[in-house]
């Protein structure tokens, strides 16, 4: 990371007691290496109905020895190119059922294959492919089916056997950390990029009123955010990871939007965030802790008062989207007496 070394290597003592004494002044307190952004696509071709998983994988290893750093000895180093090949070979051997299960397969492989590896960290991001749906009636152009049908057919709406559509509503990711000396499997799943907006049923009033305040009470405002949510499992054996991810996403959306007809009041971003986290822990007993971040994406009312001759009356229809600066609200909710890596 430095453009030039602070001292030339030739000026340092390379051997002898003085060099050993200097080395003992310092210790490596954190380390690791790996391969990032390994892209892999797996197609399950069993039967006429195909399924796909496209992932971006990162594998990082921590070795017991420091000799690769301190001595330039690479005898324990599993090359990052070998780690890349491992991703493809294990995808071929085991398939990819979910990001979490594949990450566990990779992490267990590195620990069981290389005795000199102390810890493995696997990060996986899934590309949001969804099975395509089509209206099989003759009414082309008069209606459509949304691509979230849960059954093989729904009236005139039919799920395609082998065609998919990219639907980046939200991104699925996970982190798996396995340590040789710790029997606990750390599995963290997450959602990011879930952008939502509602035009009413949001307020923000009765906050601190002092000499720094200029914002008036907001009794009815636009509420928009880009949700990032992560959760850690205390039980990884009995959980259906794909179902759990969809459940968390549904909980977040429902607590934000409420009933389709009447909505749900949101007195603050904090309260909406808390309700979502609480329901995640209520519904998913395998989850020990959940963390959420909800930046407040502002939409400010355009002031039409100076233009009453052109557009008379009040304005509650035209707003100015403002990305920066923005508020950021976050919280972590845990079951009592449980620790996490979030």
Curated annotation (Swiss-Prot):
Q: Which residues form the active site?
A: 35, 80, 298
Question: What regulates this protein's activity?
Answer: Repressed by 20-hydroxyecdysone.
Write out the catalysed reaction.
urate + O2 + H2O = 5-hydroxyisourate + H2O2
GO MF terms listed in the record are: urate oxidase activity
Q: Which SUPFAM superfamilies does the annotation name?
A: Tetrahydrobiopterin biosynthesis enzymes-like
Question: What does the function comment of this entry state?
Answer: Catalyzes the oxidation of uric acid to 5-hydroxyisourate, which is further processed to form (S)-allantoin.
Protein's recorded name? Uricase
Q: What gene is behind this protein?
A: Uro
Write out the annotated subcellular location. Peroxisome
Organism listed in the record: Drosophila virilis
Cite the EC number.
1.7.3.3
Per the UniProt entry, what are the Gene Ontology biological process annotations, in alphabetical order? purine nucleobase catabolic process; urate catabolic process
Task: Give the pathway annotation.
Answer: Purine metabolism; urate degradation; (S)-allantoin from urate: step 1/3
